[in-house]
Amino acid sequence: MFGKGGLGNLMKQAQQMQEKMQQMQEEIAKLEVTGESGAGLVKVTINGAHNCRRVEIDPSLLEDDKEMLEDLVAAAFNDAARRIEETQKEKMASVSSGMQLPPGFKMPF
């Protein structure tokens, strides 16, 4: 199944991959992205751990319907969560690129 030194090389690659993934996860946790709704009237900023860091609401919305404002805040948060997920996938894909994995081997482990 594995050629001469193949298993050893695979284990070495797996260890390197694990180190890179841990480093990438630390970087991702520090990332901040901003989601928007209502054409930018509501903005929610979250970090890579999905913790809300900031909520910005245009003053014009404070006079409007409370339910609409709540919906806009939820939509902005969901937009931010979607953006951080996309960023995480892109960064993690870059970690595994270049590895010579056996067919059918899925990452992360």
Swiss-Prot record:
Subunit comment: Homodimer.
Keyword entries, A-Z: Cytoplasm, DNA-binding
NCBIfam families, alphabetized: DNA_YbaB_EbfC
The protein, known as: Nucleoid-associated protein CKO_02678
GO CC, alphabetical: bacterial nucleoid; cytosol
Location(s), subcellular: Cytoplasm, Nucleoid
Similarity annotation: Belongs to the YbaB/EbfC family.
Gene3D superfamilies membership: Nucleoid-associated protein YbaB-like domain
Broad class of where this protein is predominantly found: cytoplasm
GO molecular function: DNA binding
UniProt cross-references to HAMAP family, sorted A to Z: DNA_YbaB_EbfC
Function comment: Binds to DNA and alters its conformation. May be involved in regulation of gene expression, nucleoid organization and DNA protection.
Pfam families: YbaB_DNA_bd
Region of interest called Disordered, as start-end residue ranges on this chain: 89-109
